């Protein structure tokens, strides 16, 4: 039986409604999928940026911590150097004061003569040369001549060697020197300095650990002494 125009129109309308519904469902499906993919991508981007921000601030934090350590180390070193300089300055001042006090020794002729006797003999025994020259301050000439005359027989007794000792009357130690003598080999290539200043410096060098211990106490950072 042939369809009437009304039936045809109904079928067409029904088919169009079906197609439209299917199209709408498809569009909704596409929209839902697109939104899902968008949300996934957005989440990925947000997470990526969050990680980048965290990484940036972690790096900054490490840099700040490193700079802090460097600054603290620098400050500790500067403080340590400042303490060392202050300690060295104190020791230098004490040695300078000790050198000034050496002048008191020469004020007593008897004490100074006994000291010169020992310094001259010690200088001769350290060189052990057949010919030696003794140099002194000009104001000590007579005292040193007496010390040399006393030292020669003592030297020969100890060393079992003959010796010729000359006193240098052309070159002297400085007038403002503390005192003592310098002893030279005959060719003046070898010298033993037995001035009061040099003996003080040598004694201070040898006793420096004890001096530092007395002034500043034990060094807790040092595990052993050399």
UniProtKB/Swiss-Prot annotation:
Assigned protein family: Belongs to the V-ATPase E subunit family.
Tissue spec. comment: Testis specific.
Protein name (database record): V-type proton ATPase subunit E 2
Protein's UniProt keywords contain Coiled coil: no
Pfam family, one: vATP-synt_E
UniProt keyword Cell cycle present: no
Entry function: Subunit of the V1 complex of vacuolar(H+)-ATPase (V-ATPase), a multisubunit enzyme composed of a peripheral complex (V1) that hydrolyzes ATP and a membrane integral complex (V0) that translocates protons. V-ATPase is responsible for acidifying and maintaining the pH of intracellular compartments and in some cell types, is targeted to the plasma membrane, where it is responsible for acidifying the extracellular environment.
Any one GO CC term of the record: cytosol
Keywords for this protein: Hydrogen ion transport, Ion transport, Transport
Subunit structure: V-ATPase is a heteromultimeric enzyme made up of two complexes: the ATP-hydrolytic V1 complex and the proton translocation V0 complex. The V1 complex consists of three catalytic AB heterodimers that form a heterohexamer, three peripheral stalks each consisting of EG heterodimers, one central rotor including subunits D and F, and the regulatory subunits C and H. The proton translocation complex V0 consists of the proton transport subunit a, a ring of proteolipid subunits c9c'', rotary subunit d, subunits e and f, and the accessory subunits ATP6AP1/Ac45 and ATP6AP2/PRR.
InterPro entries in the record: ATPase_E_C, ATPase_V1_Esu
Superkingdom of source: Eukaryota
Annotated organism of origin: Homo sapiens
A Gene Ontology biological process term: regulation of macroautophagy
Example GO molecular function: proton-transporting ATPase activity, rotational mechanism
């Amino acid at each position: 039986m042939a369809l009437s125009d009304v039936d045809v129109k109904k079928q067409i309308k029904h088919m169009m409604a079906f197609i439209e519904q299917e199209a709408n469902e498809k569009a909704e499906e596409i929209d839902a999928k697109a939104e899902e993919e968008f949300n996934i991508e957005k989440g990925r981007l947000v997470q990526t940026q969050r990680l980048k921000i965290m990484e940036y601030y972690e790096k900054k934090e490490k840099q700040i911590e490193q700079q802090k350590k460097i600054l603290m180390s620098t400050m500790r070193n500067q403080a340590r150097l400042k303490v060392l300089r202050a300690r060295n300055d104190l020791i230098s001042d004490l040695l300078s004061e000790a050198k000034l006090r050496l002048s008191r020794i020469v004020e007593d002729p008897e004490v100074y003569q006994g000291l010169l006797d020992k310094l001259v003999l010690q200088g001769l025994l350290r060189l052990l040369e057949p010919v030696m020259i003794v140099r002194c301050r000009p104001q000590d000439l007579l005292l040193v001549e007496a010390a040399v005359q006393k030292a020669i027989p003592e030297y020969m007794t100890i060393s079992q060697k003959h010796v010729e000792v000359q006193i240098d009357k052309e070159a002297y130690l400085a007038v403002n020197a503390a005192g003592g003598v310098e002893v030279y080999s005959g060719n003046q290539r070898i010298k033993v300095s037995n001035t009061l200043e040099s003996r003080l410096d040598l004694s201070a060098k040898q006793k420096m650990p004890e001096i530092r211990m007395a002034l500043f106490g034990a060094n807790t950072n040092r595990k052993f002494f050399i």
